[in-house]
């Protein structure tokens, strides 16, 4: 068990860890099916412009103008956005695990996530993530995206913590590897049980 230096801070991805992904390829495919869109064309347009949206340089309406509403549609923008938002669902066990560890170990919790502003704000408010997370280092706020190392450096600066005192949980192996390269302890999230066990190995056990 790691006892020194002790972990004082958790960095967490949101999509894939605390909540379902906000707008991944499966959701986009579902949107194309529901609204009768050409998925291949939609996906090509998505990949050409989505980074700009996630980096906070384009609004959700601007993104949708480029990807969906560049021509007349039989459905409204609000109907499409309602579908997007409705896809977000929580992973209650993970949220409560982090809440419990925060309370019992006095941890600081920071979200380090790639997501556009409107989806971020909706998800934070809808699932009351502010009750668990102290800092939101989202790509749309800081204008960097993982795996850019500066994303993690900004998170370290905002949290005022040294890398060796941070454990980072993400479901993307590459993102964890980049964080490890900066001296941050990384956990590749594949499910509740394995992540809880990995945290216990760092001295962060949840007392019943």
Please give the residue ranges for each predicted region.
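Short, acidic loop-to-helix structural element flanking the phosphoryl-transfer center
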Residues: 69, 78-110, 121, 149, ...
């Amino acid at each position: 068990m790691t006892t020194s230096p002790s972990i004082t801070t958790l960095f967490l991805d949101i999509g894939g860890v605390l909540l379902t992904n906000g707008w991944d390829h499966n959701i986009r495919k579902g949107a194309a099916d529901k609204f009768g869109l050409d998925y291949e064309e939609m996906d090509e347009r998505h990949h050409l412009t989505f980074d700009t949206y996630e980096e906070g340089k384009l609004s959700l309406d601007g993104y949708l103008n480029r990807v969906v509403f560049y021509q007349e549609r039989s459905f409204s923008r609000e109907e499409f956005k309602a579908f997007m938002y409705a896809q977000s669902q929580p992973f209650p066990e993970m949220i409560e695990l982090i809440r419990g560890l925060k309370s019992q170990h006095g941890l600081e919790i920071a979200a380090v996530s790639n997501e556009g502003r409107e989806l971020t704000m909706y998800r934070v408010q809808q699932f009351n993530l502010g009750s668990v997370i102290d800092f939101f280092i989202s790509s749309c706020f800081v204008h960097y995206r993982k795996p850019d190392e500066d994303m993690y450096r900004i998170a370290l600066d905002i949290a005022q913590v040294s890398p060796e005192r941070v454990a980072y949980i993400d479901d993307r192996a590459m993102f964890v590897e980049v964080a490890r390269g900066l001296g941050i302890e990384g956990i590749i999230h594949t499910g509740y049980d394995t992540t809880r066990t990995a945290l216990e190995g760092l001295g962060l056990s949840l007392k019943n």
